């Protein structure tokens, strides 16, 4: 096949066999967010490039190496969004919905784009669900976000496979003091740092902390600790968060090297990680960004949020075999009709059933075919039952209900009793 007729490397088709699990995951998350009082916002996938340079930071890996940036016909520099927070902040500023201290609890879903090396769990087009809260500056809202994700993991059956890591980055002033101390220490050990860490030391020193290079990790054992440079405000905030997580019974570990890859974070940062997906172990991450709105031209506004990677979480559900049986099965009932008169009757009959059982997944055979071929398609569909409507059934105004998964013998059911019968054996279990 011509390369131009193939998907771009790292940008994947999500095929019909995969979409039921995606819809299950997305539906579970959206219902949970609704229950917690969060409202959905939808932003464009393309923004002015300067938005991400100002928010994420010009010397971050995302801006320097990973963004899909192009000039449009007007000569404007545009970028496919690499993350959602900056675009959400731009939207709330543009429409003034956080003015006057209005609290906004928002969520969004959609594709993000980064030109990274594709591998399991990491793609160039990937999908995220993000949550952002504005004008709440206490540790209680930080805790709510974490408690909410903890509840989600329970709903999905993956709590035992994820671990919460926490850290506090302090205020910008505390972070600047720590940065100076870290640069001084690392500069004295420059020849022991890997090449990438030497580059980061000049551009974004805190990113050296999350290096995977063994020799650099050995140097960092004796490096200054961020916790020793925290201001009282940040320390009190962090203690308040931990107290709330303890009260909620949510286990966590303090990771002093957790800094996140975006410049706008302050105070709380957190990650949910798993050891089930290899190198790409972060499934959800976030933190506070109290200075970002002001940095982008707005008034000082507290902000906190997180994003979760849908591909990784779907992969985790599959790895742990946490795929509900009804999700794996896309059809509940498959109707086989034999003869033109039966096909006409089947159309009216199935629409009556749909009126009474709107959640029933009922598929009608299309394209005619012999009894054997239709029954084969019914079995292949994964349906629990086949409905059989032929000349004899048509004359008697009955329909055959044949179990396909070992639930007993075939029964003949009167047309006017079909909905009630299916409700008892399919919809209710």
UniProtKB/Swiss-Prot annotation:
One of its GO terms (cellular component) is cytoplasm. Keywords: Aminoacyl-tRNA synthetase, ATP-binding, Cytoplasm, Ligase, Nucleotide-binding, Protein biosynthesis. It is an enzyme of class 6 (ligase). One of its GO terms (molecular function) is histidine-tRNA ligase activity. It catalyses: tRNA(His) + L-histidine + ATP = L-histidyl-tRNA(His) + AMP + diphosphate + H(+). It is found in: Cytoplasm. Its EC number is 6.1.1.21. InterPro entries: aa-tRNA-synth_II, aa-tRNA-synth_II/BPL/LPL, Anticodon-bd, Anticodon-bd_dom_sf, His-tRNA-ligase, HisRS-like_core, HisRS/HisZ. It holds the Pfam family tRNA-synt_His. It comes from the Bacteria. GO terms for biological process: histidyl-tRNA aminoacylation. Belongs to the class-II aminoacyl-tRNA synthetase family. Homodimer. This is Histidine--tRNA ligase. It comes from Pseudomonas syringae pv. tomato (strain ATCC BAA-871 / DC3000).
